[in-house]
């Protein structure tokens, strides 16, 4: 099991001054936050992405997949271009496709774009397939972030791309070996 999944922190959020809800009582990982449940890990992701939207607006940057991932996984620490390619491939979103601000959604179809982005980023961060992503936990994370904003009947599985073998031609998985048992 990967470090992110073991920590209930699917996108590997690092320790910081942020006071997250649902943090596990015992923090044994020196680098990454450990959450009580995967839903709380996803809650933090939704909140971070909402904050990105505000920052991008102030900086007059478009809020699209490429900019989000470049901020999340900067080139100084990651192969950002490979990360973007994989997220685009897995999510079915375009690299320059605008993503709606999570806290201000008016249309569930648009909000599903953000859920697909989060699911694809979970795959890249943890080396898993879209089939293995817990979409229910992603939506529970949204509900924890903004209670009462989403109608429960709206939960829907994100389409899964079957052929993920293309990852290997672009991605050097050995760089992530330290995150795995």
Spell out what each predicted region is.
Residues 1-181:
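Cell-wall polysaccharide-cleaving catalytic domain and substrate-binding groove, primarily
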């Amino acid at each position: 099991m990967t470090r992110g999944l073991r920590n209930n922190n699917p996108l590997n959020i690092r320790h910081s001054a942020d006071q997250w809800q649902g943090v596990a009582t015992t923090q044994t990982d020196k680098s990454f936050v450990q959450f009580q449940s995967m839903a709380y890990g996803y809650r933090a992701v939704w909140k971070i992405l909402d904050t990105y939207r505000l920052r991008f607006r102030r900086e007059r940057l478009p809020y699209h997949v490429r900019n989000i991932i470049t901020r999340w996984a900067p080139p100084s620490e990651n192969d950002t271009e490979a990360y973007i390619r994989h997220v685009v491939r897995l999510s079915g979103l375009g690299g320059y496709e605008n993503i709606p601000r999570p806290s201000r959604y008016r249309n569930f179809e648009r909000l599903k774009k953000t859920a697909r982005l989060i699911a694809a980023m979970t795959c890249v961060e943890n080396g898993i397939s879209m089939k293995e992503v817990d979409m229910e936990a992603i939506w529970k994370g949204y509900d924890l972030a903004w209670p009462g904003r989403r109608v429960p009947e709206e939960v829907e599985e994100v389409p899964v791309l079957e052929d993920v073998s293309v990852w290997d031609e672009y991605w050097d998985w050995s760089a992530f070996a330290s995150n795995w048992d």
